[in-house]
Structure formats: structure tokens, C-alpha cells
Curated annotation (Swiss-Prot):
CDD domains: TPP_PYR_DXS_TK_like. It comes from the Bacteria. The keyword Transferase applies. GO terms for molecular function: transferase activity. Belongs to the transketolase family. Forms a complex with SqwG. This is 6-deoxy-6-sulfo-D-fructose transketolase subunit SqwH.
Length: 322
């Protein structure tokens, strides 16, 4: 399990994997429909609309209306998949998602693409750091972020089978390959990627690769880091997190999102109530995004392996002085 980790980008863009899966399952299940808000080219849903024109709807720049239409389709037995950038798929439609979908208990799957800093040149207005927090606070919502194409393929049938709203936080570009096809994937259950006895690193999305790089560096310093891919932030896998925290006695979280209300908060809530251990949250700290390429923004907001290593040293030192 603790094999050397090498950063390799997938050839396939994650958005294309998503549309491949939509097409594959839509051919077998006529309940599946796709909705977009004037971003069909950006999401690759245009390809779905060309092959299945009667089952794709572009509502225009009207995201809240898109959620209302999706709720109506779900009420009639369809399984709608909606898409917009995370900023518009979460904060702009929050009331409609809360009332029209979640309160009504409807089976709508919502895709938010370009999560966190990966919005890059679209800048702060399109860069949602708070979407995980928003969606995690809506009753009955499942919040999932695939780490790579292989994991998304494993997750898709489970997302379809889940009777209820799901928010999928989707990187549009090629993901770093984590070899997650070797995992036994279960929605709502964290994946153990690396074993260690000194510190637990909980990561999600693009930060999983950073966590594995950090674990390699820490190993060279004599610190054994256990790495869990918490792909489903809600429901939160308390069992796996507590098992690891009790083993290591120190925890670091890493997320491409605000530390307020997201993975870091979920871990703090779980550990605070069940297993108080030193915790350090790596993520965006109460600020808006800005224009820049991903590598620059990683450094700007501290979303790096270097920052995870620093956090790991901090919590292990605190553990040793308790």
C-alpha cells in the first residue's frame, strides 16, 4: 500500500469521463436527463445533447430555474443531472436546492465543476470556496468529490442507485491519477491510501495528491503518515476517521475549499465529540479567490504538500507534549 507516489495526469479530462458515464447509463435507463445553464461546452454536456437531444435541456443563464425544472422532472420519476460552475451550483441556487429538492426529498444529482482554486482565470466571482459548507448543511444531501476518473466510474452507479439529492464536486480538467481502481469504492466510506502510525492526513479532491506527496516527504523524516481519501464529505465516515485518529493520535485535513464548514469542520466535529486529538486544517482561510493558474493559487492559499508537512509536524509535536 505504501508505494512511492508519482504525479501523473490522466489523459482523459474528468468532465469527459462524466459525460461518457451519462451517455453509457442513459442508454440503459431512460429516466436520466441532463440540464445545463449555458455551459454545455464547458461541461462537455453538449456531446450528450447531440447524441440524446430529447433528453438534454439548456435553460440559459438561469441556474435557480434549472433546479426548479430538475425538481419537477424528479417529481415525475426522472433522474435529472444538473451542471454549473460550483459558485452557481451552490450559493446562487441555495434556496431552490434546499426547498425544491432537499425539503421535497427529490432525486436530483447536481454537478458543480471548477471547484475551489481550479476556477483559475475565471477569478474570484467564479471561485466558490464555500460550496461544500453550503451543501453539507442541507439536510439529506450527499456531498461527493471524485479524485480521478477511475473513482468516478466506480461511484456513478452508486450515485444513480442512491434515492436522494447528491452534490458532485467535479474537476473539469485532467486529474492526477491515484490508482483508485484498486479501491473497493463505497459512497460514504473513506478510502485508505497509505498506512502510518504517527499522523493521519484526511484529504479530498485535488488535495489527495498533495497528501500523498506530503506522506512521502514525512516518511523520509521518520514520520509515518496514514492517508485517507475522504471523497464523501457527507455522510462523513466517522468510523474510519476515528479508527485512524485513535491509532495515530494526530490529524491533518486538506481540502481545496474553505476550512469553515467543509472537511476540516467535519473532522473537528467528529474528533471533538469522540476522540479529542491535535488537529490542523489545511485549506482556504476565510477569504475570496482571485485570478491565477492552479499552481500559483496553491501557493497563494497554502494548498500544498509543503503546508501539509508543516501541519503534520505541528500536530505531532502537540501530541508529544500532551
Amino acid at each position: 500500500m505504501n508505494q512511492p507516489f508519482e504525479v501523473k495526469l490522466e489523459e482523459h479530462w474528468l468532465r469527459d469521463t462524466y459525460v461518457d458515464l451519462l451517455l453509457e447509463y442513459a442508454q440503459k435507463d431512460d429516466r436520466i436527463v441532463a440540464l445545463d445553464a449555458d455551459l454545455m461546452a464547458a461541461s462537455s454536456v453538449k456531446r450528450f445533447s447531440q447524441q440524446m437531444p430529447g433528453r438534454a435541456i439548456d435553460v440559459g443563464v438561469a441556474e435557480a430555474n434549472m433546479i426548479g425544472v430538475a425538481a419537477g422532472l424528479a417529481a415525475m420519476g426522472k433522474i435529472p443531472f444538473t451542471h454549473s460552475f460550483t459558485a452557481f451550483a451552490s450559493r446562487r441556487v441555495c434556496d431552490q436546492v434546499t426547498l425544491s429538492v432537499a425539503y421535497a426529498g427529490l432525486n436530483v444529482k447536481m454537478v458543480g465543476s471548477d471547484p475551489g482554486i481550479t476556477a483559475e482565470l475565471n477569478g474570484g466571482t467564479h471561485m466558490s470556496m464555500e460550496d461544500v459548507s453550503i451543501m453539507r448543511n442541507i439536510p439529506g444531501m450527499t456531498v461527493y468529490e471524485p479524485v480521478d476518473s477511475a473513482q468516478l466510474r466506480a461511484a456513478f452507479p452508486q450515485i444513480l442507485a442512491h434515492d436522494g439529492p447528491v452534490y458532485i464536486r467535479l474537476l473539469r480538467r485532467p486529474a492526477v491519477r491515484i490508482d483508485s481502481e484498486n479501491d473497493e469504492f463505497t459512497l460514504g466510506k473513506a478510502s485508505l491510501l497509505r498506512e502510518g502510525g504517527d499522523v493521519t492526513i484526511l484529504a479530498t479532491g485535488i488535495m489527495v495528491a498533495e497528501a500523498l506527496l506530503a506522506a512521502e516527504e514525512l516518511a523520509g523524516q521518520g514520520i509515518g503518515a496514514e492517508v485517507l481519501n475522504v471523497h464523501t464529505v457527507k455522510p462523513f465516515d466517522e468510523e474510519a476517521v476515528l479508527r485512524s485518529a485513535m491509532k495515530t493520535g494526530a490529524v491533518v485535513t486538506a481540502e481545496n475549499a474553505s476550512v469553515i464548514g467543509g472537511l476540516g469542520s467535519a473532522a473537528a466535529e467528529c474528533l471533538g465529540e469522540n476522540c479529542p486529538v491535535p488537529l490542523r486544517r489545511v485549506g482556504v482561510r476565510d477569504c475570496f479567490g482571485e485570478v491565477g493558474l492552479t499552481d500559483y493559487l496553491k501557493e497563494k492559499f497554502g494548498l500544498t504538500a509543503k503546508e501539509i508537512v508543516r501541519a503534520a509536524h505541528e500536530v505531532t509535536e502537540r501530541k508529544n507534549f500532551r
